[in-house]
């Protein structure tokens, strides 16, 4: 008889990489135990309710705020600081329909992750909605539309015919980037700043250059390497039009958290065992000792990845729960985009002549599932080497003015310092999970594949 406390693999932490790995191992008929000391899924990829936030606010009065994500010392948490302010408790929504994401991200419609969600039918556990890059405030303090497609370029009345031709030449280059001649050019420039590439190779400058670097690439500084930027722009253009007039998808109720739960649910369907809120005393190479004294063993133990070993940049992020009518923030050319999720970008020096980094704003309305009707959620982020409080306050004023609503009120404010991976999508996380899967089981095993189709009974 099998030992009930013995497994093929024990996974500690339910971040997205581990959740994907958990599903893949369970699909490969491995006996998997998945543990998380937190009471919620996702770790840094997860989300909190306002009730969770109130509990954490009490916890960080007693411990270092960077320790709110339990990690058992098994890895270095990417979350370095977490501060909560309830600015008007009387206006906090009474229902449970508000979430805060530790690290909100979108999914490119053309990404490998979306393909995997489709092939495995795990998308059935998610409610996916579109999101768009919307507006950018240039360094000349002019609001412009981010060019998401060729049609946007042709219809841009602020671009001369000569400028449109230059932009189209750049878009053609990106579309044919796999050509040998173009690859040689990319190799020459891959580690050099992207803005120099745009200026010297394509003679692009000014507002259109800013819209590419800070709009399409969501870069926080102008020094993004050329290869990273081109990879992002290529995904953006490939994604636009795949499912509609947008490039991004998000999952309702918190993208990262819902992705983690979707893969964990798939793992559980295939026999994986889960333990949330489970305190761990000690982790060895082949066993885990819980706080209650029980011991669990496995051929392989996987803990959350040490983010410090991966390329990252330290950022400041501010979460704001706002009460009021923010619909104009989702409006385009007089028509409501009906997305309730948009991205607004601030170029360097657009907020203040003393501030040389970009600020990125992700805005979610009630249609995203992240907040109730009559509220919206704003996420602002910039590099950590900035005077963040002043900059975020100025950006908030710009958004309030742009919203066209005179009676917006900020209810909750959360400030974070965290290490963010340099890429803005989830495919690197998928690659990491796949690499670890083959490291554990070998190259002869198939990753998230099995005979036959995914049956309705599996749900």
Swiss-Prot record:
PANTHER family recorded: CHM, RAB ESCORT PROTEIN 1 (PTHR11787:SF4), RAB GDP-DISSOCIATION INHIBITOR (PTHR11787)
Keywords: Cytoplasm, Nucleus
SUPFAM superfamilies: FAD/NAD(P)-binding domain
Recorded GO MF terms: GDP-dissociation inhibitor activity
Main location class: cytoplasm
Annotated compartments: Cytoplasm; Nucleus
Organism: Schizosaccharomyces pombe (strain 972 / ATCC 24843)
Lineage: Eukaryota, Fungi, Dikarya, Ascomycota, Taphrinomycotina
Protein name per its UniProtKB record: Uncharacterized Rab geranylgeranyltransferase C15C4.03
Family statement: Belongs to the Rab GDI family.
GO cellular component: cytosol; nucleus; Rab-protein geranylgeranyltransferase complex
GO terms under biological process: small GTPase-mediated signal transduction; vesicle-mediated transport
Top-rank taxon: Eukaryota
